[in-house]
Amino acid sequence: MSMSDPIADLLTRIRNAQMVAKTTVSVPSSKVKVAIAQVLTEEGYIDSFKVNANDGKPELEIVLKYYAGRPVIERIERVSRPGLRVYRGSDAIPQVQNGLGVAIVTTPKGVMTDRKARATGVGGEVLCYVA
């Protein structure tokens, strides 16, 4: 059976793995998932990630990050979904927790944070919020 929202599945697997204090989580890989993992690594929400090719099916393995025994990611939620896409211009991209969190946006120039999209002057689809 095909998955209707693979990005929501990625975020749910990260959330669930952190709730039970797992060190790593594996998800089926795609270009968008790798780009999201890259943004999460750059922003310091996860330690690292790598793509493993098992039997021709690439898997994205994410190493989760903890601080003082608590997950670094306190909140991770999907914004734009298959049934309700959320697009914003560069001036209307929302701030998450007054700039303490990050909105991940996919733009014509690639997947980036809300701050980088505003600085670059491009808008796009708001994929998720991370705080």
Curated annotation (Swiss-Prot):
Transmembrane segments: none annotated. One of its GO terms (biological process) is translation. GO terms for cellular component: ribonucleoprotein complex; ribosome. PANTHER family: 40S RIBOSOMAL PROTEIN S15A. NCBIfam families: PRK00136.1. One of the primary rRNA binding proteins, it binds directly to 16S rRNA central domain where it helps coordinate assembly of the platform of the 30S subunit. This is Small ribosomal subunit protein uS8. Keywords: Ribonucleoprotein, Ribosomal protein, RNA-binding, rRNA-binding.
